[in-house]
UniProtKB/Swiss-Prot annotation:
InterPro entries: CRPA (IPR008436). It comes from Chlamydia trachomatis. It is found in: Membrane. It comes from the Bacteria. The keyword Iron does not apply. Pfam families: CRPA. GO terms for cellular component: outer membrane. This is Sulfur-rich protein, serovar C. The chain crosses the membrane at residues 43-63, 69-89.
Amino acid sequence: MSTVPVVQGAGSSNSAQDISTSSAPLTLKERISNLLSSTAFKVGLVVIGLLLVIATLIFLVSAASFVNAIYLVAIPAILGCVNICVGILSMEGHCSPERWILCKKVLKTSEDIIDDGQINNSNKVFTDERLNAIDGVVESLSRRNSLVDQTQ
């Protein structure tokens, strides 16, 4: 993007004072890409996930007397945990193996606590087999995102 100084002949050290001469609008794909790669969006994902988990814990107390109501509060909690992990994985554009290991631990521990309140590895959704099955997908997405970051 080229800029022209506000006052002709006088350069500006602050780019905010310069006027853009590029009149080409951003395409929808570029705008969405900029939004999804912004730090604010990624932090927002983590915050929304935390709010879902907190809301679930609040509703667990009131739903303790209903046997079937546990599924109504477990679903938002699992979605919140997944949302937190997506936010963690997408920070800085790529997923390192350490981050993926951290996310697997967060998902397994969260499900353990939500299902019966104890950490006893009684997982049914986030099992080692299921999480290991998507290792290749996470790895390929990480490589793709790191290549995109290098080109920018």
